[in-house]
């Protein structure tokens, strides 16, 4: 079977990502209220949200390595199977403590989905098209993140708590079937570097690019932090301004839509060079947008700021992902993107913990200030990136 390299061949991959994200994002507008109705404090809420990422921190790298050895598709299918079963567990949960177990299982399933999906896409994208490929991946992810909360918020407001969870299970099953029927396991040669040394002698990161790898990973850590803030604190922040669950869904729509559109555009720009400039500018825009949130007092202002935040992520993320691919081993790509996604999930762990602890101590505005400081620190770190003129590993 020939290796597929055109963007059209990746359409089923992007569609599977879109459907999977659409499912789990349905509950975003009301999840904090759902958890706190079961007796959780803000701090407990932070732990419940964070355990999802914490499990991924522990499992993404070994699962990525396993996919390098056993094949990507079967691992991906196992992960997607959890997306169709676990949503039903939330309906019958009767305590906040039980959610820790459910979220932990969800994190294990997600470890078998996101890094493997990224590796499958990079396997089949030409070196000169990696920025565009990752831009489309992120666009699929964030366009679903834009629509899911709006749909979920409307279902919650009009049909009650259970409806979004049932739809999540249905969408998880649909993504599973799509991968099973439409996505093929890539040939081994499509993920190997021609006549390369064995894995034992092959460096994971090209010499001289370790700091660059760290800085690029910090970019997706920031994306995870933003996701953690949104999932933990956005509904409370919005409630303080008098917004309902549907309004929160609209904010997600603007944020996710902006992120998706700019991922496509700036993913193409990243393939033309200047990845470092895109990464720095995107992180700076995100920091400025976050810093202005305490000044917002209406729906229009809030949505504009979240659009700016989405634009910043859309500029920085595909460039960082492409630069990672350019400077790391192709034959160990599952492991590479396991590490890369572990950085993102570090943000998903850190974000809710910071949000919960600072909200209990200083309120929602205290959380926003803490997130702004973290965004500034990551922006400064991106100045250390060393740009590669050509892919070190194809």
Model segments located where?
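Core transmembrane helices of Major Facilitator Superfamily
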Residues: 24, 105-117, 308-320
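C-terminal membrane-cytosol helix-exit motif in multi-pass small-molecule transporters
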Residues: 170-192, 381-386
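Paired small-residue
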Residues: 86, 97-105, 289, 300-308
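Cytoplasmic helix-loop-helix junction between adjacent transmembrane helices
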Residues: 102-141
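Helix-breaking motifs and short loop linkers at transmembrane-helix boundaries and internal kinks
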Residues: 39, 71, 92-97, 109, ...
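Structural signature of the two symmetry-related core transmembrane helices
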Residues: 74-88, 277-291
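Helix-to-loop junctions at the C-terminal end of transmembrane segments
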Residues: 60-71, 262-274, 359
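Juxtamembrane intracellular "pre-TM" segments in multi-pass secondary transporters
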Residues: 1-7, 184-216
